[in-house]
Every structure is written in C-alpha cells, then in structure tokens.
Regions:
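Short, basic amphipathic alpha-helical segments that act as recognition/interaction helices
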Residues: 3-17
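Structured interaction and signal-relay segments at domain junctions
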Residues: 20-22, 29-95
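Juxtadomain coupling helices with adjacent low-complexity linkers
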Residues: 24-33, 62-72, 80, 119-147
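A short beta-strand signature within small-molecule sensing/ligand-binding domains used
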Residues: 95-105
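Short hydrophobic/glycine-rich mini-motifs in sensory/regulatory modules
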Residues: 106-116
Length: 147
C-alpha cells in the first residue's frame, strides 16, 4: 500500500505505507527495555528497514534498509537463533559487523509486519532469555496491531 501526500506547491509524494512504522515511539520504548535486559542491541523492523533500536550499536542501525537475509527470515515465519557454526546474517545493508543473534517475526492476521531481533558482533551468541524476549515482544506487537 502507498500513502499519498501533497506539498503546498501541489507536488504529489508517494510513500510506501508501513503498518508497524506508525508505532515508532512505542517500538523505541520496547527496544530500550529489551536492551536493558540483554547485552545485545535490540532492534524492531518493518518489512524494509529498522524503525527502532536501543543498545550499544544503535546509531549504526536506525533507518537502514534490511538485508536479503532478514527478508528471508521474515518469509520463513519462524524464530531464528544463531548457534556456533552458523553463518553470520547481517541485519542492515552496508553494515556487516552487526549480525542477527535472535530474530522473531511480527505476525498480524497471517501477515509478517517486521522483526523483533537482537543484534550482536561476531562471536556473541544468544541464550534462551533472548529467544523468549524476542518471541514475547513479537507476539505482543502482532496482537497489538490486530486491535
């Protein structure tokens, strides 16, 4: 879907509509809480880019477009948890040093709206707490978007 805007000069602007993008402030508060509960950078995305983040590498992620690997995780519709020996999955284009440690899709009425994920540098691996946090927050955001 597209949003259509007009400027004062009559110029028409088309912008891709992001359902979850309207929750940027709310998502930022969630990320702040998640980052305090973990040693990882907390990230919430829509289908195209990072909409909220908190933690050590926040400036390197906000607003950046997602990699094809993140798009594949969303298409898979299941929770991803990196283990030793797994290939590194960069979160954002042009930034290979931050990789997905745990990622959970945000599902709303059968559609994937984005991801809740924890990003880390090479050599950092998540545990069960990051898995459960990502799972819980993605489920909550999906339910919130349904109402």
């Amino acid at each position: 879907p597209l949003e259509i805007f007009t400027t004062r000069d009559g110029e028409v602007i088309f912008k891709k509509y992001s359902l979850i993008g309207g929750l940027e402030d709310f998502a930022a508060q969630f990320c702040d809480t998640l980052a305090r509960s973990s040693e990882f950078t907390a990230v919430i995305t829509d289908r195209d880019s990072v909409i909220a983040t908190a933690g050590p590498d926040k400036r390197d992620l906000i607003g950046r477009p997602l990699t094809s690997e993140m798009e594949q995780l969303m298409d898979g519709r299941s929770i991803y948890q990196r283990s030793r020996g797994d290939a590194a999955l960069p979160v954002c284009q042009g930034n290979d040093h931050l990789i997905a440690a745990t990622a959970a899709p945000i599902l709303c009425q059968g559609d994937v709206l984005g991801l809740v994920l924890f990003a880390a540098g090479e050599g950092q691996y998540p545990d069960e707490s990051e898995y459960k946090l990502a799972q819980t927050v993605s489920s909550f955001l999906g339910k919130h978007m349904e109402s």
